[in-house]
């Protein structure tokens, strides 16, 4: 079975993070909560599941959607309307709500998530973070009591991910909803407080602890979840991580002078980064320019060289052109101008 003997209580107003490696059953559990499992994805379900007083296995996706609002990792898969406003109002239109009331509720939901100035925009004109806001507004028009986020940071850069977590925090404070976040980017989610972390592995719950208590253990590392980097640095420096040191957030960590001295000493004596020798050029990009539309260039005069045997990371915020650059190098798109040379050949 994908899930085995899950026993879990989530209380009104809580913010709970469900973490675990890929394939551990996080999204399957989310699908049980919102009704996708087993109503949309056939399967056998045993045991009991009550969602906001509703017997979930004997209910329906439609009935559960009035209690649970789900935001998926790929917001593009949730867009229905041709504009932001239409998309937010989709559920209201299905309930045949009068237009005047529908416009008012749509505007209110848009204001809650800070997207009110984009109601006439088409989905493809939005950034990744803005799309997440629209998806969130679309489920909030039903005034659900539970907001379920299934890997909401998967397609977002770190900065936009933090903004998304801040938005979730603000929405919960304003609406007092229960928030369940499915995610393995632990450090980004802990940018704002959570009440509990549910750690899953191989379809089972391995731990159900307050963040300070879980981060003081080695359970995350043992189960393939990267702990916050500041904790890794502290461990390398020989600092003992204890729950009373409040390790859940870098700003809340309690340090004493001995801990500070250990970290400073480790930092000063860590091995220097090795300088890479100049390898023979393998891939050369010269003055590469490309745009999906004539008036707007996604890449402009990009020039770089990657040597044989090098390992290179291309980073940047959403919309910076990383994927477009990869498509051009692979030949999936044709550049407007410039050269791409592989082993000296165009």
Features from the language model and the residues they span:
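Conserved ABC ATPase signature
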Residues: 122-126, 130
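The feature captures the beta-strand-to-loop junction immediately N-terminal to the Walker
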Residues: 19-21, 315-317
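Conserved ABC transporter NBD signature motif
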Residues: 42-54, 338-345
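Conserved beta-strand-loop-alpha-helix hinge in the C-terminal portion
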Residues: 204-230
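ABC ATPase C-loop
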Residues: 139-140
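Catalytic Walker B motif of ABC-type/P-loop ATPase nucleotide-binding domains
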Residues: 147-150
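Conserved ABC ATPase "signature" region
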Residues: 100-118
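Helix-to-loop junction immediately C-terminal to a conserved catalytic motif
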Residues: 34, 330
């Amino acid at each position: 079975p994908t899930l085995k003997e899950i026993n879990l209580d989530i209380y009104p107003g809580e913010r709970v993070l469900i973490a675990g490696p890929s394939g551990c059953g996080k999204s399957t559990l989310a699908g049980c909560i919102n009704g996708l499992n087993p109503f949309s994805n056939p399967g056998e379900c045993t045991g009991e599941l009550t969602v906001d007083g509703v017997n979930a296995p004997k209910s329906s996706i439609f009935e559960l959607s009035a209690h649970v609002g789900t935001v998926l990792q790929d917001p593009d898969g949730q867009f229905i309307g041709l504009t932001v406003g239409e998309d937010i109002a989709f559920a209201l239109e299905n309930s045949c709500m009068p237009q005047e009331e529908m416009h008012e509720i749509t505007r209110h939901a848009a204001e809650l998530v800070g997207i009110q100035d984009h109601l006439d925009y088409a989905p493809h004109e939005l950034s990744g973070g803005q799309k997440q806001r629209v998806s969130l507004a679309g489920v909030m028009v039903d005034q659900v009591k539970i907001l379920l986020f299934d890997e909401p940071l998967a397609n977002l850069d770190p900065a936009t991910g933090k903004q998304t977590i801040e938005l979730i925090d603000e929405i919960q404070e304003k609406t007092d909803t229960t928030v369940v976040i499915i995610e393995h980017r632990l450090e980004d989610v802990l940018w704002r407080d959570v009440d509990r972390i549910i750690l899953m592995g191989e379809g089972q719950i391995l731990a159900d602890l307050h963040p300070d208590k879980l981060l003081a253990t080695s359970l995350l590392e043992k189960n393939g979840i990267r702990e916050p980097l500041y904790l890794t640095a502290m461990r390398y420096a020989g600092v003992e991580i204890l729950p009373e040191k409040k390790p859940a957030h870098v700003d809340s960590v309690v340090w004493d002078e001995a801990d500070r001295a250990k970290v400073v000493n480790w930092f000063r004596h860590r091995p220097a980064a090795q300088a890479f020798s100049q390898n023979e050029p393998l891939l050369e990009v010269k003055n590469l320019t490309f745009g999906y539309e004539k008036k707007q260039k996604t890449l402009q005069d990009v020039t770089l060289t990657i040597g044989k045997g090098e390992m290179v990371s291309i980073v940047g915020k959403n919309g910076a052109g990383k994927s477009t650059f990869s498509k051009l190098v692979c030949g999936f798109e044709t550049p407007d101008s410039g050269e791409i040379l592989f082993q000296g050949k165009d």
